[in-house]
């Protein structure tokens, strides 16, 4: 379950921190208020491809950090991958205007394929 999302320099968002509650969470608001940016940020931290257009105008990089609560199956997967396994999974992803980026899971560097394998077990976006 997604507990917290921190977004920095993504599209029109300079900094945003969102705490999600248990159960169903709904994003609502007027046109242009940033709902799609939040969904794009979630997809980005889950492993979707990034491009320069997502970086806020005037900045050189953007980042998204997501905190998930997970069960034993995800903990076992993390352990099998040689990563720190706990009830909390922290996924951090940064993308720079030069096309480079960093991905970390619980502070450990991972590649995009590993990220997608892990996050496939953490959240469903509909």
Question: What does each model-found stretch correspond to?
Answer:
Residues 3-126:
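Gly/Lys-enriched N-terminal cap/neck module of very large, oligomeric protein machines
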